[in-house]
């Protein structure tokens, strides 16, 4: 096989908010080991999940490049991430980092280190978890009766559309009313059969604006799309 690596995001995957269980993570590690494939694990949202399963890296540490970040789990302004790599990949990772980024900002790295050691980072993680749960509660209230997928500790909602609704048209109608959502096809990676859906982000806005925006989406979904478009 020409496959040299597999990319996984097992915790609250963007966009469907799925959480991979420990057994599945272990199975992926076993298959990668059998075929000598590297694993790139994106766990930038993982710390937001309480009692989440061990990362894939825990099952295959000798071949997993583990990526995480402060940006999604503490504050957006702390733009720094970390990559933990097995010994055999360290030289290649360091070389690629020098070519693409040269170095992280030392002050930002120092702040991140201090926050980890003095407990500030975990305080912010707990705050983010609570904020996301409030926003997911709002989504559950406004989207009641609508087919969607989410987790209480997730940043997104994956909203299923009727089979005859075009994603692009639905997204355009929402945008005309001041609501930005993403078409599901933006995340499609194969030609397999596809059910129309959109991704809704619950961040980057106030809770009041979120409630209003979700209300617009619900009306678009449950109402007559042609009537709603003409009424704008």
List where the protein language model places each region:
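Active-site phosphate-binding strand-loop segment of PLP-dependent enzymes
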Residues: 1-49, 228
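Active-site PLP attachment segment
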Residues: 58-92, 104-107
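Short hydrophobic/aromatic beta-strand micro-patches
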Residues: 84, 158-160, 201-203
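Structural signature of PLP-dependent enzymes
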Residues: 94-98, 116-140, 164-166
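Conserved glycine-rich beta-strand-loop-beta hairpin in the small C-terminal domain of fold type I
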Residues: 129-140, 148-160, 170
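Short, conserved charged micro-motifs
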Residues: 165-171, 207-212
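PLP-dependent enzyme catalytic core of the Aspartate aminotransferase-like
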Residues: 176, 191-232
